């Protein structure tokens, strides 16, 4: 999952910039964590993807090294969104939501696991979802591109 509203498409683990396909997801931000909503998901300034920032380490970024948050303001404060991702919800998908999104325990990125291939991981090989929640993400009610719904764009601020 990556930010797609600028000319810069970030760095994809498969090489080059990200290629958007599918839905435009809308991620809630700066809300409290709940029993079915996990916070500490951040935007990476290097690869332009979403990664989990809840551990002491920050995974492996396709842009090199570990993922990195937006830089702090001059006064040291931070204004980058802290995304809340809903998980393990009992209801099924709707016309404006999609399940089968997972945390990769190797790169710490968020990836779509609804295809036989689990995608290319920046840490090598395919993504590994062992131990991950199954996330369900809300999206705008737009038609699919016909290429699958595995790459998306997100708003940095909601």
Residue ranges and their predicted role:
Residues 1-158:
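Trp/Gly-enriched beta-strand/coil motifs that build multi-repeat beta-propeller-like domains
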């Amino acid at each position: 999952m990556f930010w797609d509203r600028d000319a810069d498409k970030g760095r994809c683990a498969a090489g080059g910039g990200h290629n958007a396909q599918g839905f435009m997801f809308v991620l809630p931000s700066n809300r409290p964590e709940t029993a079915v909503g996990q916070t500490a998901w951040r935007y990476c300034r290097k690869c332009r993807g979403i990664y989990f920032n809840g551990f002491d380490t920050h995974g492996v970024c396709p842009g090199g090294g570990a993922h990195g948050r937006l830089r702090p303001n001059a006064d040291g404060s931070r204004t980058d969104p802290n995304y809340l991702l809903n998980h393990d919800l009992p209801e099924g998908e709707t016309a404006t939501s999609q399940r089968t999104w997972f945390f990769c325990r190797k790169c710490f990125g968020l990836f779509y696991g609804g295809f036989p291939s689990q995608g290319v991981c920046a840490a090598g090989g395919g993504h590994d979802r062992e131990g991950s929640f199954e996330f369900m993400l809300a999206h705008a009610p737009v038609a699919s591109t016909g290429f699958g719904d595995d790459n998306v764009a997100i708003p940095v601020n909601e």
